[in-house]
Amino acid sequence: MSKFRVGAIVPVKTFLRAKTRLNLSEEKTEQICSIMLESVLSAISQSNVIERTVIVSKDESAFNMGKKFGAIQIYEQEELGVNNAVMLGDSYFVKEDFDLTIVFPQDIPLIQPEDVRMLFEMKGSNRCVLVVPSRKFDGTNALLRMPADVMETHYDEDSYKIHLNTAEKKNATSALILIPRIMLDVDDQADLRLILTRDLPVSKSLESVFKS
C-alpha cells in the first residue's frame, strides 16, 4: 500500500436510469451496469494503491455490489449529478485526512489494477491534477486530485479541458494522461460492441447479456 492515503470515489447512477442510450431492456441494462461496476471495483480493490473506496449512489444494487469490496456507502437523497456525488465523496475524504482521491466512473469495464497504479504513479507534486479523458475526448474518465480538496469537479461541461484549466487556476500542476482501458467508457451500443472485441473476462460477461 502507498505511503499516501489514497481514496477512490465512484459515483453510481441508479442502474435503471443509467445508460438509456444502450436501448436495451431494463433487465439487460441493469445487468450490464452491475457487471461494469463490479469490474471497476475489482480493479480498484486489487491495485494495492487505494486505501478506501466510497460509492455515492441511491441504488441498493450498487451498494450491495460495493459490500463485496468493502466500499463505504454514501446515500444520495436525490440524484443531482456527478459533481454533487463527487462533492459528497470529497467531504468524506477531507474529513478522514486522505492525501488524494481518484474519481472513477461506473462504466469503464476494461480497467485493470495496473491502470490504477499507473495513474497514481504519474502524479508529480503534492499539489496536482491528472485527467484521463474519454476515448472521444469529450469527457473525464478518471480524475486524480492532490490534495483531495484542491478543486471542485466540472463533469458534463466539456469536463477534461475545464478540469485542466481549473487546476491551473488553483496553482496545481496538471497533465492529460492517456490510459487506453480507462478511456473506453460505455455510452451506447457502438461503445459496447467495441468492448466485446476485447479478450477479457468482463467482455465475455457483457457479451452473454448483450446477445442473450
Predicted regions and their residues:
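N-terminal nucleotide-binding beta1-loop-alpha1 segment
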Residues: 1-22
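Conserved alpha/beta core of the MobA/IspD/sugar-nucleotide pyrophosphorylase nucleotidyltransferase superfamily
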Residues: 2, 168-212
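A short, N-terminal amphipathic alpha-helix
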Residues: 34-49
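Acidic donor-binding segment of Leloir-type glycosyltransferases
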Residues: 48-72
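Short phosphate-binding loop-to-helix
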Residues: 67-100
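The conserved acidic donor/metal-binding loop of glycosyltransferases
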Residues: 105-109
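Conserved donor-nucleotide/metal-binding helix-loop-beta segment in metal-dependent transferases, i.e.
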Residues: 111-137
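Short, glycine-/small-residue-rich phosphate/pyrophosphate-handling segment
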Residues: 144-167
